[in-house]
């Protein structure tokens, strides 16, 4: 089987029984189950959710997204071998660790296949919960341009690139484009202050103003748990993005949970600790791929300037990236996943066929 056939690039065409449109994101696709199938699985599998809770099948792909574009490689390679399974395995590992440390639950109810989660529908908090322990990336670029206030927080002068910050910095941004919120620009991923959230907590989908402190607590606790575990395997947790939402448990009680993925090479920066101590940065995350793209194309401003999105999409569509770059990234994902989970990631020969088989035979979700 060829390399391109091992990659799951298209994940929104599976014959999963649903009566709603499939939601296809940059990396994951979501199939909302029928009310009948949701109720049946909750009863059969004993999921700790309300009997009428809507469930979904979430299928990850191997697609690679960077700078808001999907990239492809030479030879018809439409994704990164092993990426989807690696991301899910890492998230599964951290969510279990959160549970072991008595943190909040996640939206995941079941894991039928390395590419698949069965999830409970949640009401999302409309915030990208970003936190930073080091000054790097976009924050460093803004700092070099003279910015000293980030999301309402003043940071000191004379910081150096990639320096550890004295405290974990919470720098939230909007999740999508939010309209009608005073002082918040109607664009995607705009930075917001805690005051913005407090003044408009219901617009950000918080159930109460007190839950702002709860989300911050869960963000800090989750970061600390992952940071300690990564430190134990000589890695540094540099920065990350969490997402949160509300669900009801089996008794009908509303609770704030972790959503999406956590602590992955896509949602975080992870550095090699020993290299950092000797003054070098070795990226064990997607950041290395972003740096490759910035160096690969003659006009990196196209990738950084949101006013040049048409040019950026054309760049991603019209250019096949070197196979070596795609495979280097594959190695990054597979290696860091093996370090974190303690087990190698097994590559599927035909992930799509495997997914259909397990959902048909064990969950009766394919006709």
UniProtKB/Swiss-Prot annotation:
Pathway named in the protein's UniProt entry: Purine metabolism; IMP biosynthesis via de novo pathway; 5-amino-1-(5-phospho-D-ribosyl)imidazole-4-carboxamide from 5-amino-1-(5-phospho-D-ribosyl)imidazole-4-carboxylate: step 1/2
Gene Ontology biological process: 'de novo' IMP biosynthetic process
Keywords, comma-separated and alphabetical: ATP-binding, Ligase, Nucleotide-binding, Purine biosynthesis
Disulfide bonds: none
EC number of this enzyme: 6.3.2.6
Gene3D superfamilies tied to this protein: ATP-grasp fold, B domain, Phosphorylase Kinase, domain 1
Catalyzed reaction equations: 5-amino-1-(5-phospho-D-ribosyl)imidazole-4-carboxylate + L-aspartate + ATP = (2S)-2-[5-amino-1-(5-phospho-beta-D-ribosyl)imidazole-4-carboxamido]succinate + ADP + phosphate + 2 H(+)
Coiled coil regions in record: none
Top enzyme category: ligase
Statement: the UniProt record of this protein carries the keyword Nucleotide-binding: yes
Domain of life the protein comes from: Bacteria
UniProt GO MF annotations: ATP binding; phosphoribosylaminoimidazolesuccinocarboxamide synthase activity
InterPro entries: SAICAR_synt/ADE2_N, SAICAR_synthase_Vibrio-typ
Keyword Oxidoreductase annotated: no
One Gene Ontology term, aspect cellular component: cytoplasm
Family membership: Belongs to the SAICAR synthetase family.
HAMAP family: SAICAR_synth
PANTHER family registered for this protein in UniProt: PHOSPHORIBOSYLAMINOIMIDAZOLE-SUCCINOCARBOXAMIDE SYNTHASE
Protein name as it appears in the record: Phosphoribosylaminoimidazole-succinocarboxamide synthase
Encoding gene, per UniProt annotation: purC
């Amino acid at each position: 089987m060829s390399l391109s056939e091992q990659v799951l690039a298209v994940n929104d065409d599976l014959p999963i029984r649903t009566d709603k449109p499939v939601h296809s994101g940059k990396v994951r696709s979501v199939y909302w189950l029928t009310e009948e199938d949701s109720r049946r699985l909750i009863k059969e599998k004993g999921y700790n959710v309300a009997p009428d809770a809507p469930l979904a099948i979430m299928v990850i792909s191997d697609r690679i997204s960077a700078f808001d574009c999907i990239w492809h490689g030479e030879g018809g390679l439409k994704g990164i071998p092993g990426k989807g399974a690696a991301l899910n395995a890492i998230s599964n590992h951290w969510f279990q660790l959160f549970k072991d440390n008595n943190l909040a639950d996640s939206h995941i109810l079941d894991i039928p296949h390395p590419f698949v989660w069965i999830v409970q529908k949640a009401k999302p908090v409309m915030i990208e919960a970003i936190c930073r322990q080091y000054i790097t990336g976009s924050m460093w670029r803004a700092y070099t341009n003279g910015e000293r206030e980030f999301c309402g927080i003043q940071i000191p002068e004379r910081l150096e690139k990639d320096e550890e910050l004295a405290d974990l910095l919470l720098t939230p941004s909007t999740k999508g484009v939010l309209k009608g919120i005073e002082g918040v620009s109607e664009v995607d991923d705009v930075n917001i202050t805690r005051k913005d959230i407090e003044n408009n907590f219901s617009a950000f989908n918080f159930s109460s103003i007190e839950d702002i402190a709860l989300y911050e607590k869960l963000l800090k606790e989750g970061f600390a748990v992952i940071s300690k575990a990564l430190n134990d395997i000589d890695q540094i947790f540099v920065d990350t993005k969490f997402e949160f939402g509300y669900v009801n448990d089996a008794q009908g009680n509303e609770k704030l949970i972790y959503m999406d993925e956590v602590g992955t090479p896509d949602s975080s920066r992870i550095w090699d600790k020993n290299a950092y101590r000797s003054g070098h940065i070795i990226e064990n995350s997607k950041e290395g791929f972003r740096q490759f793209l910035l160096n690969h194309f003659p006009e990196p401003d196209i990738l950084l300037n949101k006013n040049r999105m048409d040019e950026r999409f054309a760049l991603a569509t019209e250019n096949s990236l070197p196979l070596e770059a795609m495979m280097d990234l594959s190695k990054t994902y597979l290696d860091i996943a093996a370090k974190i989970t303690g087990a190698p990631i097994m590559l599927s020969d035909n992930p799509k066929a495997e997914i259909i088989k397990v959902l048909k035979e064990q969950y009766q979700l394919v006709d």
